[in-house]
Design a protein with these regions (language model features):
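Polar/acidic, low-complexity leader/linker segments enriched in S/T/G and N/D
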Residues: 1-41, 176-184
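Short, solvent-exposed beta-alpha or beta-beta edge segments that form flexible loop/patches at the rim
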Residues: 50-78
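Mixed-charge, glycine-accented linear interaction segment located at domain edges/termini
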Residues: 129-185
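Extended, positively charged loop/linker patches that create polyanion-binding surfaces
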Residues: 89-121
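Beta-strand-rich interaction surfaces with strong enrichment in secreted/lumenal proteins
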Residues: 64-67, 122, 146-148
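Extended, acidic-biased charged interface segments
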Residues: 115-132, 136
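Oligomerization/assembly interface segments of phage tail-like spikes and tubes
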Residues: 67-89, 151-166
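A generic structural signal for short beta-strands and their flanking turns/coil linkers
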Residues: 45, 71-77, 103, 116-118
């Protein structure tokens, strides 16, 4: 088994969302509970986890740092969704901004409100090793510019900010007896 992991999306489902507060699955090899709805495929750019910490240096009278305290911490994931579906659009702009009637989906792209908080989950596979990263409380806080061009997939790239005390969690299960990573199945 290799300590170097590849962040390859699972071919049978990569990105899921569920109501805010839904518990994250505890075993990456088990079936995803039905409370989680599949959002769609993530592009080959993969997901990007970013953490940010703001600190304050406490100094004594001689201007020597005596203590460093964290004043702010944030975690975000950017996930370029390459599926343009009713479910992916509900995730990006909020369910209230997506309607469907007679097979026609209409999306309000101009709403100035953020979508409601949800739970989010991404599933990855590297050979027989499985990983998930997710949060029980997160919110789409931004969406990158969307290009509509011939010969290229339309990617909806939300930035999801983890909220509350839990933040994002990485859950990993390594295959027993594996000798190395072989790529996605």
């Amino acid at each position: 088994m290799s300590e170097v992991k590849l962040g390859l999306g699972l071919s049978t489902g990569m990105f899921y969302h569920a109501p805010k507060g839904t518990a994250l699955p505890t075993d990456p090899t088990a079936a995803i509970p039905s409370t989680w709805k599949e959002v769609g495929d993530v592009s080959d750019a993969g997901i990007t986890l970013a953490t940010s910490k703001t600190v304050t240096n406490l100094r004594n009278w001689a201007n020597a740092i005596k203590r460093v305290i964290m004043t702010e911490h944030s975690e975000t994931i950017q996930a370029p969704i390459m599926d343009t579906t009713e479910e992916s659009l509900k995730t990006v702009v909020g369910e209230a901004n997506v309607s469907k009637a007679n097979g026609v989906v209409t999306v309000n792209l101009s709403d100035g409100e953020l979508p409601p908080e949800e739970a989010f989950l991404w599933v990855m596979k590297d050979g027989d090793d499985m990983m998930m990263i997710g949060c029980t409380q997160g919110q789409v806080s931004a969406v990158d510019n969307v290009s509509f061009a011939p010969g290229a997939a339309i990617n909806w790239t939300p930035t999801i900010t983890a909220m509350g005390d839990d933040g994002f969690k990485l859950i990993m299960k390594e295959a027993t007896g594996a000798t190395g990573a072989t790529g996605a199945s």
